Design a protein with these regions (language model features):
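N-terminal secretory signal peptides that target proteins for export/translocation
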Residues: 1-14
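Bacterial N-terminal signal peptides
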Residues: 17-29
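Extracellular, repeat-based ectodomains that mediate carbohydrate processing or recognition
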Residues: 33-477
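Extracytoplasmic
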Residues: 321, 405-408, 460-461, 468-469, ...
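Extracellular and select intracellular beta-sandwich modules with Ser/Thr-enriched
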Residues: 647, 746-750
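Glycine-centered coil/turn sites that cap beta-strands in beta-rich domains
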Residues: 663-678, 682-702, 724-727, 743
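Short, surface-exposed loop/turn motifs with a glycine/proline- and acidic-biased composition
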Residues: 713-745
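Short beta-strand edge segments in extracellular beta-sheet folds
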Residues: 751-756
Length: 756
């Protein structure tokens, strides 16, 4: 220990303390200004107007072979674009390499059938030939399913499957929801809907979804209330489709939760008992009571009587376990059910022989008046059975109220018996709702949700956002580039001429204004600050990176968290998006490699919007296009000043590179050991050696002086032996860092010094 401190003194402890004090003082200043909209991770906007229900799957899919993420939503007149987008069924194909989304309209909204309704969101399937299949239906409005196929950059014409004409005897109930699955062992594609007899029905295809036939009815119940059950599905893609269901709507009945699965054209209980020997004929259609009970109404957990259950998510894993998350009302009066019940989250797990249940925490009150059981929902991780995410107005760590719906990550080390929680969003101004995680792989996670104001399923002002966690890469600290006359022109290349400079709001004259006293560099470029707004010309800021390589890029703008300030930006003119502060995160202390201004007077803060990734080969410069858009949200073209203003400050970029290289050594250690890194001090690489006496899961991470995670070097099961890990710290600033290793019950921290 003394040698470590002596070493630090030799390289300049005064310099390190100076850096640390600057960071700490900036941190104190930022949080004394009531910083809001904090997110753990790089927040990405996928669609500026959209929401989804949770009974259509898959809502999001990853095409790893082509590097795409595909998602679907329904748009609202209350969001960006106003009434012309109302009810549009939309698909977004997000380029995972470039970090840029492309939005398509699958079906334009209209007032008769496809009016705005989040139940109309599409489901997707990546076909065996690489084409994308999208399926959607209108909520409670007709008896049809609609589908389109994406190939070579184009969505084909819409095709209609009319259940009333395709089902023998017709259909007596409207079609809602879409759930697409392909079983390679059968060569069949399935789509499950709510339809005839208010029950789950299926259609199937033997040509990957080009044409379809009626299949059958999955279950049947006596008619009670709105419909006969809600179904969540998951498939292994080979020979089995699992489903979790309720018997009715929890508003109409004290519902329980059941499980079954389809295999070889038959329906089974959890333990493999056949309850329907042919799902394609109407002779034997089981009821939900014939399936395996997962969680019965009136069950007691932690002294709380749970009633009126509803399913949220289901997932099967390679080891044969099945997991589901449900919600239930806590201590509700069965004789006089609450109109605003106390909803709770419950985790259920099947270990191959029995179902068990674990209380997770409070889910919060209803989302809006007529839907007492609508909550923020939850998501199981398809590639990690030990990880879940929930959306709640209560912190699951202590049940304290957080005001709005926040996203929390739960991790278990004992098969779901207990959970450790980490907040993903904090101090949000608006709700974060309905998280979803598509299947990817063990090293990559996509977490998506939508953020905004949810008035009803037919009226919302929300944007789809999310985080991509890719363990194979590291993103260094950001570098900030202030937008000035030296690097910013009009997009056509002509000189930027502004009004000002002064400390006042700029006039509504369709010209950018230089407003002093805010931002980095002492000013911001502003538009639409007063009156009925304005339309200033598009800008282009040129950024010089230090070298060739891959860089993530953000635009920085200022906003009042409770207003609707925004900026339009992109790496190309055609790729520009409108970013409102409600769908963005605030910049935090420590994000950049130098101290920058994060807060201003009048409850203003610096926000960031992710624009994508640039690949620089020989040239080390790139352009960012920036514009205003003072059109009032919820209208197609009404300009407005003040609330829709733009305050542009500058651009941030960060180097992207591989995390580490790992070398395994043939040794037989007797104990857990974390050695001091070598060399130390170092620039830019150092090697960390650790030894394991047994096979164990290892977490090896680097933290800065504030305790913020800088890099994950190892996070996986490792074999016994001695291993070398190299940390590439080319994007880290000078200073002290800590390397922490956790392996089983072993934990140790060492100091490292980056000196540049």
């Amino acid at each position: 220990m003394e040698r470590d401190f002596a070493m630090i003194r030799r390289v300049g402890i005064a310099r390190l303390l100076h850096v640390a004090m600057m960071v700490v003082s900036c941190w104190i200043a930022a949080f004394s200004q009531n910083q809001r909209d904090l997110v753990k991770g790089n927040l990405i906007q996928f669609n500026d107007n959209g929401a989804w229900c949770w009974y259509q799957d898959e809502r999001v899919v990853v095409d790893a072979a082509r590097g795409n993420l595909i998602l679907g939503t329904d748009a609202s007149a209350s969001g960006v674009g106003g009434s012309p987008r109302s009810g549009d069924v939309e698909a977004v194909i997000y380029d995972l390499q470039a970090g840029v989304p492309q939005r398509f309209t699958l079906r334009e909204g209209e007032s008769r059938v496809f009016y705005c309704d989040d139940h109309n969101s599409p489901a997707f399937l990546i076909r065996q030939d690489g084409k994308y299949l999208a399926m959607y239906a209108a909520h409670f409005n007709d008896t049809s399913s609609y589908y389109r196929i994406y190939d070579a950059g184009v969505w084909g014409a819409e095709t209609r499957f009319n259940w009333k004409t395709e089902r023998p005897g017709g259909a007596n109930f409207q079609t809602t929801y879409s759930n697409l699955f392909y079983l390679s062992a059968e060569g069949r594609t399935y789509n499950f809907v709510r339809g005839n007899n208010k029950s789950p029905n299926l259609m199937f295809s033997t040509d990957m979804g080009d044409t379809w036939s009626y299949g059958g009815q999955l279950t049947t119940n006596a008619n009670i209330g709105y419909n006969n059950g809600y179904y969540k599905y998951w498939s292994n893609g080979v020979d089995r489709i699992d489903f979790i269901c309720s018997d009715y709507h929890p508003r109409d009945y004290n519902t329980s939760i059941f499980h079954g699965y389809v295999k070889n054209g038959e329906t089974y209980t959890s333990d493999g008992i056949v309850v329907d020997d042919n799902i394609f004929d109407p002779l034997t259609v089981p009821s939900t009571a014939d399936l395996t009970t997962v969680f019965a109404a009136n069950s007691v957990l932690q002294g709380i009587t749970m009633t009126r259950c509803w399913n949220i998510d289901v997932q099967t894993y390679e080891d044969g376990t099945i997991a589901t998350i449900i919600k239930a009302r806590a201590n509700d009066n069965p004789a006089n059910p609450s109109q605003d019940p106390d909803n709770r989250f419950i985790y259920c797990r099947y270990d191959g022989s029995k179902w068990t249940s674990t209380y997770l925490g409070k889910a919060g009150k209803k989302l809006y008046g007529s839907e007492q059981d609508y909550t923020g929902l939850a998501a199981l991780h398809p590639n990690d059975p030990n990880t879940i995410y929930i959306s709640s107005t209560f912190d699951p760590r202590d049940s304290s109220s957080v005001g709005v719906h926040e996203i929390f990550k739960g991790v278990t080390a004992d098969n779901g018996a207990t959970w450790t929680w980490i907040p993903i969003t904090q101090k949000s101004v608006r709700d974060n709702l309905r998280p979803v995680i598509p299947a990817w792989d063990e090293n990559n996670t996509a977490l998506l949700w939508w953020r905004g104001t949810y008035t009803s399923a037919q009226n919302f002002n929300a944007a789809v956002v999310g985080i991509l966690d890719r363990r194979s890469e590291t993103v260094g600290p950001m570098s900030y580039v202030d937008a000035t006359s030296a690097n910013t022109l009009l997009a056509d290349g002509s000189t930027l001429v502004t009004t000002g400079p002064d400390s006042l709001a700029g006039p509504a004259d369709n010209t950018w204004h230089q407003r002093m006293g805010f931002g980095n560099g002492g000013f911001v470029l502003t538009s639409a600050e007063v009156g009925s707004g304005e339309n200033a010309p598009m800008l282009k800021t040129r950024v010089s990176a230090p070298s060739a390589g891959a860089y993530d890029v953000w635009v920085n703008f200022w906003a009042n968290p409770t207003a609707d300030w925004r900026i339009k930006a992109g790496l190309t003119v055609g790729g520009m998006q409108l970013f409102r502060q409600m769908a963005c995160k605030q910049v935090e202390v420590g994000d950049h490699n130098a101290t920058i201004v994060l807060t201003g007077s009048g409850n203003t803060f610096l926000y960031q919007a992710y624009l994508g990734r640039v690949q620089l080969s020989t040239e080390s410069e790139f352009d960012v296009y920036v514009d205003d858009e003072a059109i009032r949200v919820g209208t197609p073209s009404t300009f407005t000043g003040d609330v829709a203003r733009t305050w542009y400050d500058g651009i941030s970029y960060a180097r992207v590179g591989p995390v580490v290289s790992v070398t395994e050594r043939d040794t037989d250690p007797r104990d857990f050991v974390l050695e001091q890194n070598y060399p130390n001090p170092f620039n830019p690489m150092t090697t960390i050696r650790y030894s394991l006496p047994q096979n164990v899961h290892v977490n090896l991470k680097v933290y800065d002086l504030l305790g913020q995670e800088v890099a994950t070097l190892v996070s996986k099961d490792m074999p016994a032996g001695t291993h070398d890990v190299t940390w590439h710290a080319q994007n880290a600033s000078s200073g002290v860092y800590f390397c922490r290793m956790a392996a089983g019950k072993f934990s140790k921290v060492t100091r490292m010094l980056v000196l540049k």
